[in-house]
Amino acid sequence: MIKVDKLPDVFIKAMPVLQTLEDAGFEAYFVGGSVRDLLLDRHVHDVDITTSAYPEEVKELFAKSIDTGIRHGTVTVLYGGESYEITTFRTESGYQDYRRPDHVTFVQNLDEDLKRRDFTINALAMDLHGQIVDLFNGVEDLKNHIIRAVGDPEKRFHEDALRMMRAVRFTSQLKFNLEEKTEQAIKDNHELLKKISVERIREEFVKMGIGPHSRQAFQIFLDTQLSEDVPDFAGKKELLQIYPQLQFSPTLETSLWSLIIILLKLPDEDISKFMRDWKNSNAMTEQVERIIKFFDLISDHTPNDYELFQAGERTIINTIDVAHILGQPVASEALVDRYLALPIKKPAELAIDGRFLIKHGMRPGAELGHTLNKIRELVVSSRLENSPDAIEKYLEDLD
């Protein structure tokens, strides 16, 4: 049996929670992703705890708790300034929506609880003394960099179809490979993904897409035909096949969506709908549209100063990132340096505003907006000094 001697602070801080449960006569373990990441020497953000205590028994032991998912056996305990999800050992049955169990049964056996988990590398538990409980050779799979379903993969994916996306996502994040039977079960059951909400799929897709091994994971995503069951990808395998051959993997979500849109050759008028279909936020959609617009511009010609100003620093940098990933030559340093050298970089930095123009006899309306934009363009391109006096003289000369 493996024993971990040196534990990160996140586990040490949670030890009194396990000790409290054990002192009351219950079993308690750290479980799941935190144990996996500990053994992989990855940063552990938070820990999950599983116990033989029923939810009401957990609540009696701790002064502060929240019923976060009490029907399914989960109580959040507030302790030492941290919150800990504590879930009773359980088995599950009946998955009519291919996502959540219809019935949860509390059990007194850790083994039964671990059997219901998705992958061997996530079906690991650790006790108070750092002893690892490994019923399904998860530690061996960690060593061999393998994602393998616990037990029968078909059964696991029928219980929760999102697990198919999670499997591919883990290959990207962890740089692991899919075990043969697990991959075959995804190929045989990929259509079940249609039963899952787009929001859930999107979350896994983004994690897959910006993971360090995303190009290889994307190839699995295509080969297993999961790509046929997500918004707007059906029948587009040939276009998307370029993704695994990209120069680099994207590390930003904006870059990921921009790359997908470019590969799909979506016209500008379809971008907003595509982003909505994937349940992206308006802010994300706006950022991606700006990147695509600037990417098209730099693909066509070298931008002038005002075009750099209109794009803004973040869009310029993000677009350069996309161009590099696609292997498109772009004078990145020159573009950024030129932007940083602009007389003004934001509309608010202009020395005057619309009220200044009104004070000088201009009526509110389209002409005022046009004049303000013209002044801004002249200032940005260093053809007009950014001062009220210089702008006032420019207005007088117009008259």
Swiss-Prot record:
Q: Which GO terms describe its biological process?
A: RNA repair; tRNA 3'-terminal CCA addition
The reply to whether Isomerase figures as a keyword in the UniProt entry is no
Q: Which residues bind CTP?
A: 33, 36, 117, 160, 163, 166, 169
Q: Which UniProt keywords apply?
A: ATP-binding, Magnesium, Metal-binding, Nucleotide-binding, Nucleotidyltransferase, RNA repair, RNA-binding, Transferase, tRNA processing
Query: Which EC number applies?
Result: 2.7.7.72
The prosthetic group or cofactor this protein requires is: Mg(2+)
Catalysed reaction, written as an equation: a tRNA precursor + 2 CTP + ATP = a tRNA with a 3' CCA end + 3 diphosphate; a tRNA with a 3' CCA end + 2 CTP + ATP = a tRNA with a 3' CCACCA end + 3 diphosphate
Keyword ATP-binding recorded: yes
Q: Name one GO molecular function term.
A: tRNA binding
HAMAP family documented for this protein: CCA_bact_type3
Q: What else is known?
A: A single active site specifically recognizes both ATP and CTP and is responsible for their addition.
Q: Kindly give the PANTHER family that the UniProt entry links to this protein.
A: CCA TRNA NUCLEOTIDYLTRANSFERASE 1, MITOCHONDRIAL
Query: Which family does the record claim for this protein?
Result: Belongs to the tRNA nucleotidyltransferase/poly(A) polymerase family. Bacterial CCA-adding enzyme type 3 subfamily.
* The protein's name: CCA-adding enzyme
